[in-house]
């Protein structure tokens, strides 16, 4: 490889090759490889690659800390993490894309019940989509499509529970270029410029 893109998780690893393809960038032709580095390893792998003269760029979850990194080729997500980046689709009226992904991936489709404990752990404590803990379970088919709060609570929890390389691959397949979070488009284009 002439350049490496370092990502934190399974979902990013699965989705990035298809994101690149939708940006008209063939990772193989450009000699770009995507490496799943895990959370804290992105920085260390960038530093190691630089010692060997290998151009690379990495992205890690901001986890709510949006201060810029002191390393130019270490980027942070605009939102808290990969799953939160996907929630922007709800904000732009494209919730059906998330529903399509869920229905293809999950055998229970819109009938999947997420328990209150899981929702509170992610949607309330981690993301802050819920303003207070809830005591009831949620099922996607019961959520009004105008209830942005509950949609984000449901989807952020579901994507968090199910994050994996196969889910990332499906996300990469289902999102159009305009639906790919801009931070990832910019990162892939920057990687191409390093080759």
Where are these regions (language model features)?
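Acidic, Mg2+-coordinating catalytic modules of nucleic-acid enzymes
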Residues: 1-6, 10-195
